[in-house]
Amino acid sequence: RGLGDVYKRQLFIIGFSSYSKVLKEKPLIDRITEITSKENYVKFDSMSKNYINAVIAIEDHRYYDHGAVDFIALARALFTNIRDKEFDEGGSTITQQVSKNIFFNQEKSISRKLGEAFGAFDLEKNYSKNEIFELYVNTAYFGDGYYGIYAASHGYYNKDPKDLTLDESSMLAGVPNAPSVYAPTVNIGLARQRQKQVLNSMLTYGYISEKDKSDVLN
């Protein structure tokens, strides 16, 4: 027990130090204001319900039920990382991904992951779930030089995010996980495979029917 407490304390210090460092560079409120004041920032109510549901289903289906960190998913991911002796991105909530996007670079390290968690707690303390969702889709990268859902929606489909169909929504929701692989202009076959994963998740969590899914895929 003593060693476990020491280990937890060390992890806490590492995470807190990592987050404190980036906060000194630019405070949270300044970072958020910089993002939300952009001309093409898309509000939650200006997104297609299909798109919102697709993102939640594939990225973080318990988003509205857990806090900043989904400890169930994180524990599962950490176990896998230790077992496979490699660091993976698994277990991140949407809030943690926002924290990563606005505070940290894409470096894979334990200190960044822990700092990301501190950022996530700070975000959930100051912003609503819908506001955090907005931040996620407005800072995500969709490939082809498109940052944010406005650029992706117009770039790929020439329409506003509120007008995205289920087909388009399920395609775009799958891209940020690996834009260099899943962007529809990179490899349409892999993009369609990823889209099918999104639709399967939407079906599993009750967002669409089997017919909705087959209408898109056939």
Regions found by a protein language model. Give the residues of each.
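Juxtamembrane regions of bacterial inner-membrane/periplasmic proteins
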Residues: 1, 5-218
